[in-house]
């Protein structure tokens, strides 16, 4: 029995792949398994993705789009918190996203702005450190806000 509506196989495959990614990691994703789960022929996913790498690229692109939505319209401090929140909620996708080039819309947010680049680097690094357990016991959003406040204080004091 098929688990998708006609004409919606690509989004169904991406949803299933995203679930596998977060539960089992990217190594567990295969087009054949996704076809089986969707109840379609093993060749059907190839109408939407040339190969496994194309599927992973689509997952990463979708992740960047979701991240952009999470950041949109927020002041920079809230963007920093939203960035960390996104990474913590989607650790496997977050890691996958940064195995590829950052898309132009996100790259342009920091391009040519040294403070924005430094803030992104700091927040991205904090996200990875939190994910790897280096700030165990600390509330992530409070950590981000405190770190940003300390950096702003240091800038004013310099």
Residue ranges and their predicted role:
Residues 13-21, 63, 67, 83:
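Short hydrophobic clusters on alpha-helical segments that form packing/core surfaces
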Residues 12, 16, 20-54, 58:
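Helix-turn-helix
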Residues 30, 95-98, 138-139:
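Short, hydrophobic secondary-structure boundary micro-motifs
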Residues 77-100, 120:
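Helical hydrophobic small-molecule/effector-binding pocket
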Residues 1-8, 19, 158:
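N-terminal intrinsically disordered/low-complexity leader segments
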Residues 103-151, 155-158:
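Hydrophobic/aromatic-rich alpha-helical bundle segments in the mid-to-C-terminal region
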Residues 21, 55-63, 97-101:
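Alpha-helical DNA-contacting segments of helix-turn-helix folds
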Residues 61-79, 102:
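Amphipathic alpha-helical linker/stalk segments
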């Amino acid at each position: 029995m098929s688990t998708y509506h006609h004409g919606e196989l690509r989004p169904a495959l991406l949803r299933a792949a995203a679930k596998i990614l977060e539960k089992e990691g990217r190594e567990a994703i295969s087009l054949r398994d996704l076809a089986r789960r969707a109840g379609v022929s093993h060749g059907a996913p190839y109408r939407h993705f040339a190969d496994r790498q194309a599927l992973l690229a689509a997952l990463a692109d979708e992740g960047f789009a979701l991240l952009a939505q999470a950041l949109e319209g927020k002041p920079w401090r809230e963007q920093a918190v939203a960035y960390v929140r996104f990474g913590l909620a989607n650790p496997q996708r977050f890691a996958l996203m940064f195995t590829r080039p950052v898309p132009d819309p996100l790259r342009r947010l920091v391009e040519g702005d040294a403070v924005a680049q430094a803030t992104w680097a700091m927040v991205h690094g904090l996200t990875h450190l939190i994910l790897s357990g280096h700030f165990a016991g600390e509330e992530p959003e409070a950590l981000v806000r405190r770190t940003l406040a300390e950096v702003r204080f240091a800038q004013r004091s310099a």
